[in-house]
């Protein structure tokens, strides 16, 4: 986000300098821990989690990442990925059967390097649950697609899983590029 410690290049927002500094040890990047967050953890954030896991796997970088997702609300705790979101992932050969929605916890802020929200309401609730963002770890996914002021719309309400898929894919590709 502008003015929050990120550098902008021509295509997307760079990862915070603090993340780069804490991850580089003796010439080797340590494991990158990413938590995707949305309202219920049944559509957008699990789509981002499994898309990112797929991108990382296809890049041969599975051992370098820990990727998960969470909700800001308690409404869907324990539920699987919402069926239309699950079908959209399956169309692209991405399984998500093991997913069970969980809520974001205060200590997730210390556990993860980046906490990526899908919309501004998510960010607001993430700040509240985690007690702030003192290390500039919280960002919107579309910052990494070069669209810092845009949000990934919630297909639970819009019914548009194609647009959500495209936004999630672009955001995750940009995020992976920035981390490498």
Task: Set out the residue ranges of the language-model regions.
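Short, Lys/Arg-enriched N-terminal segments with co-localized hydrophobic residues
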Residues: 8, 12-30
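Phosphate-binding/catalytic loops
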Residues: 114, 120-180
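Intrinsically disordered, low-complexity regions enriched for glutamine and histidine
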Residues: 2, 21-23, 37
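Conserved active-site segments centered on acidic
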Residues: 29-111, 177-180
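Helix N-cap/beta->alpha junction signal
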Residues: 2, 45, 119-120
């Amino acid at each position: 986000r502008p003015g929050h410690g990120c550098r902008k290049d021509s295509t997307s927002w760079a990862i915070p300098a603090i993340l780069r500094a804490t991850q580089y040890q003796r010439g080797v990047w340590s494991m990158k821990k990413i938590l995707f967050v949305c309202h219920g953890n049944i559509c957008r954030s699990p789509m981002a989690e499994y898309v990112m896991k797929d991108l990382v796997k296809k890049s041969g970088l599975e051992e370098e990442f820990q990727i998960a997702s969470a909700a800001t609300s308690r409404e869907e705790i324990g539920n699987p990925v919402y069926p239309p979101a699950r079908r959209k992932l399956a169309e692209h050969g991405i399984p998500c059967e093991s997913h069970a929605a969980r809520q974001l916890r205060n200590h997730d802020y210390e556990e993860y390097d980046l906490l990526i929200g899908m919309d501004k309401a998510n960010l607001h609730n993430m700040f509240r649950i985690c007690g702030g963002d003192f290390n500039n770890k919280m960002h919107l996914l579309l910052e990494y697609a070069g669209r810092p002021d845009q949000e990934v719309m919630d297909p639970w309400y819009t019914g548009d899983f194609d647009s959500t898929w495209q936004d999630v894919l672009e955001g995750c590709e940009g995020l992976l590029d920035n981390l490498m």
